[in-house]
């Protein structure tokens, strides 16, 4: 099989694999408030998963890989959800901008993303693309081993 890219891998499996890679690597800077903050105004409680920041970073990296340039506003819309307003009609609420902004800044610090001066927003770097493709390849290899 030729070059395997992120597009060729199931999204959920890739995000879990890349989040595990980021945690194992230990270079991703994590803010001190991640264990207490909610990720959106539509949520009642903070995330139950202790490693949710790594999962969000992996999801953001994959999202930007697939779409070239993405800003904080677009990520807020993507990670937002429906707010339960009781007996009133539900409405979409964007996710926390601070969380997505800090994730982008963390990925920038480890060299996965860079700022796009012309269009605005962030784009994937060559080293970041190489890392993501390598993780995608290992994910496909693990799937093939499981099939045998």
Swiss-Prot record:
Sorted alphabetically, the keyword list is: Ribonucleoprotein, Ribosomal protein
Signal peptide (UniProt feature, chain positions):
none
Q: Where is the composition biased (Basic and acidic residues)?
A: 130-140
Answer yes or no on keyword Ribosomal protein: yes
SUPFAM superfamilies reported in the protein's UniProt record: Winged helix' DNA-binding domain
Q: Which domain of life is it from?
A: Eukaryota
Gene name? rps19
Q: Which Pfam families match?
A: Ribosomal_S19e (PF01090)
Its recorded name reads Small ribosomal subunit protein eS19
PANTHER family annotated for this entry?
40S RIBOSOMAL PROTEIN S19
Which residue stretches belong to region Disordered? 79-98, 116-148
What's an example Gene Ontology biological process for this entry?
A: ribosomal small subunit assembly
Q: Which GO terms describe its cellular component?
A: cytosolic small ribosomal subunit
GO MF annotation list: RNA binding; structural constituent of ribosome
Q: Which family does it belong to?
A: Belongs to the eukaryotic ribosomal protein eS19 family.
Residue spans of biased composition, Basic residues class: 79-90
